[in-house]
Every structure is written in C-alpha cells, then in structure tokens.
Amino acid sequence: MDFDDHDEGDGDEEMPPMPLSSGYDAPMQPGLGGGGGGVPKPGGGVGGGGGGGGGGGGGGARYRECLKNHAVGIGGHAVDGCGEFMASGEEGSIDALRCAACGCHRNFHRKESESPTGVGPAEPSAVSPAAISAYGASPHHQFSPYYRTPAGYLHHQQHQMAAAAAAAAAAAAGGYPQRPLALPSTSHSGRDEGDDMSGMVGPMVIGPMVGMSLGSAGPSGSGSGKKRFRTKFTQEQKDKMLAFAERLGWRIQKHDEAAVQQFCEEVCVKRHVLKVWMHNNKHTLGKKAP
C-alpha cells in the first residue's frame, strides 16, 4: 500500500517546463552534447543547445566578427566592425540570439569551431548562403567558403551568355558569317555603302532591310512610291506669268485678288500654281528684270 501511495504521489507532481533552446536544436538525450545534434562531447558532459554564452554560443562554437552587409541597398559592402558576438539576454531567451554590441542576429557572425581537429560537427544553426542573402548580407570570399557571388548576378550573366550562343548558332545555321551586329562606320567615306553593310549585319537585321528596300522601290526609283506631279508650262505661259509678276511686284496682295483670278482664267493655270511659280522664280527671274 505504501508503494502504491508513493506512485500516486509521483503522478501528481507537475513536470518542470522544458527550457527553450536558443540554437533551435533537436531534443538531446542525457549525456550527449548539444552542438552536434546528438553527438557526444569530447569531455563527456551534458552540453548546451548551441546557445550564445561566453563568445556568442555554446556547443563547442564561438561567433566572431559580424559579417552583415549594411550597404547592400546601394550595391556596396560595409560592415559595422563588431568583433565578437555578445548575447543580449540569458540562455534560452529570444534576446540570446541578438548581439548586444551591433544588434544583429547571431547568424550574421562568423562561426568558429572550438574542436581540436578544427572541424566541428554539423549544427543546424550553421550559416547558409540563402540565409545570408535573405538577411541582406553580401557574400564575401575572404571570410568563409560558404559565401558565393549573388545568385541574381550569375543568373543574369548566364542568360546573356545563353542568348549570345543561341544567336551564334542561328547565324551559323543560316550560312551568315558570325560577325558582331553593328552599324557601318561613317568615317570610311571612300568605301562603298554596300561593302560596309555586307559583313557587319546579321540575319535579324538583313531581313527587315530587304523588306524596306523592296517596299520603297517605286516606278521612278526614288525613296517614295508615289511619283511627284510637276506642272509643265509653255513658253507663252511663262512669258505672261513673268510680265504679270513684275506688274504685281512678285507679291499677291488682297486688293489684287480680282486681277489674279482673271489672269489665271486667261492663262489656264490655277491660283496656287501661279503663287508657287512666283515664289520659286522671285530671286532668279525677278533680279534679271531691269
């Protein structure tokens, strides 16, 4: 009976709350180290869960200088100069993951293993390139082998290289020489325009140019397809228009409208045609007249 009462008394006792691990490690068995995710410590004791005590973290690791890039917004690289992680709160609290010196998260600080071999066990709190890029830290090659060039830059560069390779393959398949797409130079005036254009344009440029040249070729061979109409005058009409223009002073004014209308009916020319002829010959025939 005493033994049963003792069991009932033990069942009524309240279990103590489990401390919150600052390193987000999995629950460990007694006698195992905390930094290695279930790997025994060299000393044989019970280790903490990757906390930030004494140099920035337990479990056989220390967190040194801060690597957070504070100039990532302007495309530069600048660190705050914090030399070592110092936890802002007690072990097990959320503040234990924030540095009291620089205010950055512990993951921004360089992790240094304290194991004798120099290679510590893999911890869940190890800094990954994705976490660094998400928090705005610029990867730098001199701090840790985890850091790489930003993924966006590599993707853009690879996209340009792939596009250039595709263009070169298309040019080779079409039988065109692989030459850079460029406009002909205007400094070489001695060469023929066709010679300059033949070796410097690709298939994507030649197609539209051929279409433009075929569409613009008209009956007269000029730039526009529509032929310009030019009025031809007889010598008698020219003589009469010259005499009439000299009488008006090579200017058509409002009070001369009646005379101009009568003259156009006699010579069989339109008013705007007479006006254009006077404008074109004002400085040639007008100056020759005495």
UniProtKB/Swiss-Prot annotation:
Disulfide cross-links: none
GO biological process: regulation of developmental process
DNA-binding region: 226-289
Site, Required for DNA-binding: residue positions: M278
Residue spans of biased composition, Acidic residues class: 1-15
Cellular component, GO annotation: nucleus
Keywords: DNA-binding, Homeobox, Metal-binding, Nucleus, Transcription, Transcription regulation, Zinc, Zinc-finger
PROSITE patterns, A to Z: ZF_HD_DIMER (PS51523)
Keyword Aminoacyl-tRNA synthetase (UniProt): no
Matching InterPro entries: Homeodomain-like_sf (IPR009057), Homeodomain_ZF_HD (IPR006455), ZF_HD_homeobox_Cys/His_dimer (IPR006456)
Zinc finger (ZF-HD dimerization-type): 63-112
Subunit structure: Homo- and heterodimer with other ZFHD proteins.
Primary role: Putative transcription factor.
Name used for this protein in its record: Zinc-finger homeodomain protein 2
Originating species: Oryza sativa subsp. indica (Rice)
